[in-house]
């Protein structure tokens, strides 16, 4: 019996090594740089021990580091838009009657573009480790944990599900320094589609006050 078990182990061969997480994230960064746009439906879940869990959905369109539109269908009307010069944060669901206008940061890691957070020079910015093989919406994904080397970055850990076909993120779990955990899941991803400039234009509705910060 012992001899049989030993023979079976020999036939099975040595255990397969995990993929190199640094190579995976660098490959994802190259794929990200190669596309001209990223479009997807998103589901966002923010978990906070103080305020509970907040779930939202919508559509995200991103083109380069400085142009992004997150337009929410739930809550309807909310939007975060980067137009190349400013970040517009419009949340009538919680703060009606005003829109915040912020100057665009020079470092994309400090703006709302979470893809740029993760995929801008990741080998230099983060320590990485391979977590597991998984699936997102039926697609194979490699799960990598990133820990910032720079403690001034706005999060202390990010778990990234990298699609095994196009290498781009399909899910992000970001542990922010304030204690919140934000999870973004992308479905229906399309890349390098032509995106008109109006996508990244925000026009304040009549009667809405613009608050500069």
Task: Kindly give the residue locations of the regions a language model identified.
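N-terminal leader/targeting segments and the immediate start of mature chains
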Residues: 5-54, 65, 204-213
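Hydrophobic lipid-interacting interfaces of membrane-associated proteins
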Residues: 45-48, 75, 151, 179
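Extended beta-sheet lipid-handling architectures
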Residues: 40-42, 55-60, 174, 184-186
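Extracytoplasmic/secreted envelope proteins and their assembly/folding machinery
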Residues: 22-25, 29, 112-116, 159
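Short hydrophobic/aromatic-rich beta-strand segments that constitute the beta-sheet cores
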Residues: 42, 68-72, 87-90, 146, ...
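An acidic-aromatic
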Residues: 59-111, 182-183
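Gly/Pro-enriched, hydrophobic low-complexity segments
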Residues: 114-117, 123-207, 211-213
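Extracytoplasmic
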Residues: 35-37, 55-57, 63-67, 75, ...
């Amino acid at each position: 019996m012992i001899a049989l078990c030993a023979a079976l182990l020999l036939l099975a061969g040595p255990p397969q090594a995990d993929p190199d997480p640094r190579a995976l994230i660098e490959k994802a960064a190259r794929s990200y740089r190669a596309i001209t746009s990223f479009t997807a439906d998103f589901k966002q879940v923010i978990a906070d021990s103080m305020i509970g869990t907040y779930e939202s959905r919508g559509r995200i369109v991103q083109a380069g580091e400085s142009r992004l539109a997150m337009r929410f269908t739930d809550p309807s009307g909310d939007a975060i838009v980067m137009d190349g010069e400013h970040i517009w944060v419009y949340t009538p669901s919680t703060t009606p009657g005003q829109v915040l206008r912020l100057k665009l940061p020079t470092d994309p890691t400090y703006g709302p573009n979470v893809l740029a957070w993760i995929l801008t020079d990741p080998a230099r910015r983060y320590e990485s480790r391979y977590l597991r093989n998984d699936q997102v919406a039926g697609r194979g994904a490699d799960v990598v944990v990133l820990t910032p080397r720079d403690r001034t970055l706005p999060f202390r850990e990010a778990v990234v599900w990298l699609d095994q076909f196009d290498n781009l993120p399909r899910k992000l779990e970001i542990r922010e320094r304030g204690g919140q955990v934000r999870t973004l899941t992308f479905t229906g991803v399309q890349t390098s589609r032509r995106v008109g400039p109006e996508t990244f234009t925000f026009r304040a509705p009549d009667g809405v006050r613009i608050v500069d910060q």
